[in-house]
Amino acid sequence: MKRFFSVLLFCLGAAISGSELQLSSPRAIKVDDPEDPVQIFAAQELQRHLKMISGIEHPVGETEPATFVIGRKAPSDMERMNTGEGRYTFENNVLYFYGEDYYDRKRSLDKILADRDNRTGTLNSVYTFLDQECGVRWTAPGNDRIVFIPRNSVVLKEKKVNKWRLPLEFAFVRPYFWNPKLIAGNNKRVPEELRFSSSEVYRKRLEHIVWTRRMRLGANEIIRFGHAFTDYQDRFLKTHPEYLGMNQDGSRGLPDQLKNRVKLCVSNEAVVDQIISDWQANGAKKYLNVCPNDGTPGFCRCPRCLALDERRENERFLDHLTDRYVNFWNRIAAKAVKIRPDVTLVTYAYSYYRFAPRREKIQYPENILLGLVPMLMEDNRRIMEEWRKAGVRHFFLRPNDLCYEAVYFRGFERGIWEQFSAARDIGLNGMDFDACIGNPATELDFYIAARAMTKPQMSFEEIEKEYLSIYGSAAPVAKKFYELYRRNGDKMMRKVYRKLKQEKRYLLDSGQIPIVIQEKINFYYPVSLMREASALLEETLQYASELNESERRHLARLKSLNDHSIMTFELVEALNRKAADIEEKRNKLLKYRIQHKDLGFCWPLLFTRPRAEGNLKIR
């Protein structure tokens, strides 16, 4: 998208001394290893963006001499690279892009890019150049959401080695919303006009994966974590049922449909020995994943596990299970460090064991990496500080803030940044957002999250300004639009929080929000605010003659998204009160969705998932 900032370019050119790399005529892009799919992709990405910026197509090939070289270290750069690091260096009229890479070149490109353990330092060097030297911004997945500053040249310092490495050990946003299997299973449950072909799903999924790479998300080191005991029921229910959590009726294990969420009898020392044995059989790697399986059923109620709890008077069984788990982790660590002193146990503080322990302390603080899964609307800074007092020195965050699947703008972008900022100030090793990329109502949320993780020094206002640059001269109007929703966002979230608390439930996942608000939507969302937001955009579209075609298109899309949310609100509100005009509103909404299929929603999942509209039966 074109942005003419001639004054800015003049100031930049005057302030920087260096060599000017001309982009106004075709210059060759050479791939150092033509068998490497990521190097080829890096060259294609450089070519694509340079054409946007300069209007010139720079050819990709193997011919010499080349102006841009992908995958070859600059001759003067003798320094060893860190894992995941990307560098670019301008030397003797050649711009070298290179980095520390870790992936299997025999795999297909999409699989390499999708595997978050793969390190793509060379690709990151291209994106760092485009970000830092060319002002490119990837506001959302897709090439039509790229913002750039047109230019005919770039000024670079001779032999300056420009380095970039992820400031956290890992930073992820999980891009699994456009899941081919999920969509294929639900395609037939939506109107034919809103179904997606397998090729469309593949394209959208790749767009989302590429966006995470463009934002330079990934890892500097392979640290495996996640539900660690999903196979324990299959492995041990018949031979060692005592390994599994005891239910209230004295039985062990869970129903088959929940077996991958089975809990362990954490007081049983044989369970510790089994975990150590499995770890050794797998090579006793540095990181030992002991993250408990989540979900409510199955926490062990045997006398010995109950004796490990530090429960206060009048507390329910599930109110505080942390002490049993800290005791469990300490016992695992005690045996693991004897085998490998630098081992790191990776685990979660989540749901009923997210608060710091009351009795236990972390006995091996250098050997524990704790993933805090924060609850929305909680004082997570205080929770992290209490865990620090219990002995934890190494944290990562694993929020569910981006699992929101409803079509309504929720106004929680600043909350996401503030949560990150609190963790950053206390000390943060990494961050892993469980997420549903693909909801256009949360594009700003995703940009805030991704940019904060890769540029943690940026303020909320700076990141928001970058995102809003997609609207060009209409950015102030778009800013006001989001501020309108932010005005209601905190109130809405607190209402949801209180509602769940009354029902003795927790707001652990933003996917819970649509389920709650759609039971009584006009209590949570003032439709007057939604209409005010649309009127603001409509007035700008009608009377702002200075908008160019691209700015007008993006602003019109924002209005269409908001109009769509109003129509959805009206239908849900009619369903809530069993109104006579439900069918009329349903048909109106379906017609609008068919006319606006390309708004960006994953319709088969929006219609069918309970976290979206599955409970409403909108079709």
Predicted regions and their residues:
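Short, internal active-site loops enriched in acidic
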Residues: A74, N293-G298, Y350-P357
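Sec-dependent N-terminal signal peptides
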Residues: F4-G13
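Acidic, contiguous N-terminal accessory segments
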Residues: I16-Y88, V147-K160
